[in-house]
Amino acid sequence: MQGNPGNQGNRESVEESYSDMRTNLLVVDGFYHNVDGVRQFALSQEFDVIGNYPGKRTKAFNNDSTQDKIQNFLYPHAGKIIDWMESEDQYCGSFQISYATDRSWIHTDDHNNWAGVLYLTPNAPTTSGTGFYRSKINGSIYGKNDDAVGDYAQDKTQWDLVGEVHNIYNRLVLFRADQWHTSMEYFGNNNKNGRL
């Protein structure tokens, strides 16, 4: 595009008006080389951890190789990860299974700065991904679960869907954990055909 040299002052004022931009979301397709093997490993585990989330989880399987790979994606946008939350009551690296009967709610993940979801069900409904929301109450896409808008976590009439990442096999979604988000839908009725 060719510009008019007489508009140089306008260009500088536009450049000075940029905000402090922030990366909120990274999508990585083809995360695992041997995704079928990872899926089989996941399905061979005990899904016996039940908590304040839909479905059931395994214990955490966080390892150096996975941490390094995630760190390489996040570093340019968020700097070095200093806490992988490896205590017994955290779920970093765990597998989660849920079925069509499960339900979620709009929430944030207050205990960390970034969150991640890796889709491990082949041929899943693409509409069963992760949705991101803006509050109709205060217009914010960021918050904490104890905010007043968090009281409306299950009332989707109080929210606008502002972004969605589809569920694609072997897709990793990394996102700022203070964004309002939820799982879009669930499917299946057993570990082999449920949302992993």
Task: List each language-model region with its residue ranges.
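Catalytic core of non-heme Fe(II) oxygenases with the double-stranded beta-helix
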Residues: 98-196
